Amino acid sequence: DFLYDDILIVDTEEEFFEEYGSWPLKRKDIAKMVTNLKRLGAEVIALDMIMDFPNGYGEDPILAEALQESGKTMVVSLLNLDTPIWYSLGETRLNGITDATEILNESTERGYTNVTEIGGQLSRIRFYPEIIKEHNIWPYAVQALAMYLDVEPSLEDGVLTLGDLSMPLDEYNFLWIDFPKLPGGLTFLKQTPAVITALEVLMDLEDLEDLDEEEFLEETEDLREMVEGKLVLVGDTSEMSHDIFETPVGEVYGIEIIADTVATMMKQQPIRPAPFAFEALVMLILLLAFFAVSQLKKFENLVFLLVIVVYSAINIYFYIYHGLVFSLSYPLVACFLSMITINLYLFMLERKQKTFIRGAFSQYLSPAVIDMIVKDPDKLKLGGERREMTAFFSDIQGFSTVSESLTPEELVQLLNEYLTSMCEIISSYNGTVDKFEGDAI
């Protein structure tokens, strides 16, 4: 479950901008929001906003002052990275850092929000140890949580430590996000009590800003209960922001991903890739299962699919109850390719066998008998089999005399009519024509 008691999202969504009247949010109004959140008791105020260009209305000093006076605040930075095609193929080089404007950057903390999508999905955040060490810049969620806990983050030997919290990264320095289970019927975190609209901390408080502290707290008692002591993330889920990503649990807004990452670290329950030995054992079992299935004479494809379903169910079980992730896509692709390859091989083998049977026996056996053998080649047993049979022999009585009275053309016509009739009788009983001897069959 999400940590509603520790994390709050303030959302500048569609409804907010409809009432606000313009987009994006003016920096003097961001300053008001920061000041109001601090007065409401927010422990940390993290703005998920890129402010790398100076404000055209000279409002940066106003926001810088609000950030500085509010204490634990932070803004977004972006790492300009030269990344290899695949993260395991080489080192990522830093070509610079896009920070907020100088006056804002000097007034607050920063964290990078670069994301790495794998397979078209965002499921983890990446750490860059050399960049962190040289430039002292951490992933946004890590920096926010470190400020909330009043600790300095550290990364040693692949283990992230935040005070009493510690969690291992994977071999590529990724922290896997444990996306929370939302209440039934809800799609986004913004639909839960973890999120309030920015209307409540900006427009709704306009008439209260000039009140003294005691009166302000009295008038905002309910709102203060939602904000006080929390790590507050301010972000934009409006359609204009395009800040939404595909994840293993569906579409998730960028600010929600930050919140989910913070919650994952607070619970010390990051999703972990299964150990290599464990994964190798499962793959061996899967391989043996496929080998056993390939020996079946019937329903092998159905059993193949059953094995795949069982494997997927095991993956889901370990993911939900133990936080372990197996390499699901590669084995499943391998399974399907194996199934297709085996079926193609068997099809070609069967086709070759059928071609041989038809070629070898088409001159001797009736089509019905050939079809029977093609359907069940095991009927061709060396040594034969004992059964009751009928021997059919027929010829034309006095053929020599008859043939002498006919022209060659008439004789051929007679033989064709006669032998054809005899063959039809034999075929009607699924018989086999052994040979023709003149007028005899």
Predicted segment positions?
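Structured core elements
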Residues: I9, A46, W176, V232-G235, ...
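Substrate-access "cap/lid" subdomains that shape
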Residues: E156-L217
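Feature representing long, continuous alpha-helical segments
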Residues: I257-D260, T264, L286, T355, ...
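Catalytic NTP-binding/metal-coordinating core of nucleotidyl cyclase/transferase enzymes
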Residues: L380-I441
